[in-house]
Regions:
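Conserved N-terminal phosphate-binding loop of PLP-dependent enzymes in the Aspartate aminotransferase
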Residues: 1-430
Length: 430
């Protein structure tokens, strides 16, 4: 390690707060100098194949020339302009593209600058919808356990109280209704009784519940679980039956990650409100969106105070809109759903040996997602360093070691990633 790198890392450790990391007992951070394709270039000269897509966002790889050019062109025109009282072509055209590609019935788009804020917006929309209808008592939310929806205030209240990483705030957050997580797995037999608890809750509390929020098909940071599409289909039906809005959080799953453009397509349903983010801009600029129906948007506008009460400073940022256009262009041009199917097949083949290890509870693969659930919680610092030593970047948590590689990864790069992934886990479990 040279002197410059050491100085930077020392200052970082002393003064820069990292996510879910203690400044007094820090886990090692690696200094990244540049990135290209699926590779992270470290300051010490090592290259790592990124198996995380930088927390599931960078689907088109790093330093993508098409993405760079789109952002650069927009930068020379207009980097930012307020969205109150003003608008611009990139935001207008993006709204049309999103409405055209998302499930039928979503006709209005609200832009924000992060996934957590997109969820905040979704929850506020649901509350204001019922307020406008003269039913303010419908002010609580229902959700499943093992869910995760972000780290801002209202989203924390609908994260799992135990696995959602927000236990210390339990006594100050809004109290919501939780049902057990879906028990029927994605590729196993469906049991309709999986939804009985939801129906019992709706029968008893429908007058209080504004909406049911859920991550469609894949529960992300709350457990990386894949559940049966018929659960989501049945949930849609129950929401209709009991007059509850259905909110889906597609921030991690949207734009092809599960093998469908949006995960709720596995169930053939349309939500009342949908959140998107992460891959929307391929991680190039922070950006997110909340889509809703004509009924929700217009009902809000017809009640008091006549407008939806939210307005981020960087709403509809032109650079972010340009990045989103470029990302969607590449999704369409590169036939990413076909590529994701190829990634899925290779993951199933090359990670199969992990399922035989005694300490592995389950190997789960869907689309471009692979999850190894272990019996015990991992030692993150040890395991992270082992992955780096083997030339790959993987960030485990809890009992889970998983990968979500960029869609642009080649077959040989994926083989290297899988080989190192298997070698490290096998070594770690010895």
């Amino acid at each position: 390690m040279n002197n410059k790198t050491k100085r930077l890392l020392d200052y970082d450790e002393k003064h820069v707060l990292h996510p879910y990391t203690s400044p007094t007992k820090p886990i090692r951070s690696y200094l990244v100098e540049s990135a290209q394709g699926v590779y992270l270039q470290l300051s010490d000269g090592r290259q790592l194949v990124d198996g995380m897509s930088s927390w599931w966002a960078v689907i088109h790889g790093y330093n993508n020339s098409y993405m760079n050019e789109a952002i650069t062109q927009q930068l020379h025109k207009m980097s930012h302009v307020m969205f109150g009282g003003l608008t611009h072509e990139p935001a207008i055209r993006l709204a049309k593209r999103l409405i055209d590609m998302t499930p039928k019935g979503l006709e209005h788009v609200f832009y924000s600058d992060s996934g957590s804020v997109a969820v905040e917006v979704a929850l506020k929309m649901a509350l204001q919808y019922w307020y406008s209808l003269g039913r303010p008592q419908k002010c609580k939310f229902a959700t499943v356990r093992s869910g995760y929806h972000g780290d801002t205030w209202h989203p924390m209240s609908v994260c799992d109280p135990v696995t959602g990483m927000h236990q210390i705030f339990t006594n100050t957050l809004s109290v919501q209704y939780f049902v057990n997580k879906p028990s029927c797995k994605f590729n196993k037999e469906w049991d309709p009784s999986d939804l009985d608890e939801v129906e019992r809750l709706f029968e008893e509390k429908q007058h209080e519940i504004a909406g049911f929020i859920i991550e469609p098909i894949v529960q992300g940071a709350g457990g990386m679980r894949f559940y049966h599409p018929k659960y989501l289909k049945g949930l849609r039906d129950l929401c209709d039956k009991y007059d509850v809005l259905l909110l889906v959080d597609e921030i991690a799953t949207g734009f092809g990650r599960t093998g469908k453009m949006f995960a709720c397509e596995w169930a053939g349903i349309s939500p009342d409100i949908m959140c998107i983010g992460k891959a929307l801009t391929s991680g190039y600029i922070t950006f997110a969106g909340t889509l809703t129906t004509h009924q929700v948007a217009h009902t809000i506008s017809e009640g008091y105070p006549g407008v939806f009460m939210h307005g981020p400073t960087f709403m509809g940022n032109p650079l972010a809109c340009a990045a989103a256009h470029a990302s969607i262009d590449l999704i369409e041009q590169n036939k990413v759903l076909l590529k994701v199917k190829q990634i899925e097949a290779q993951l199933k083949k090359e990670l199969a040996s992990l399922a035989t290890l005694e300490a592995v509870v389950e190997l789960r693969i869907l689309g471009a997602i692979a999850v190894v659930e272990l019996q015990d919680e991992v030692k993150m610092d040890l395991l992270q360093d082992l992955f780096v030593e083997h030339g790959i970047w993987i960030r485990p948590f809890g009992k889970l070691v998983y990968m979500m590689p960029p869609y642009v990864i080649t077959s040989s790069e994926l083989s290297f990633l899988c080989s190192a992934f298997c070698a490290v886990i096998t070594k770690y479990l010895r």
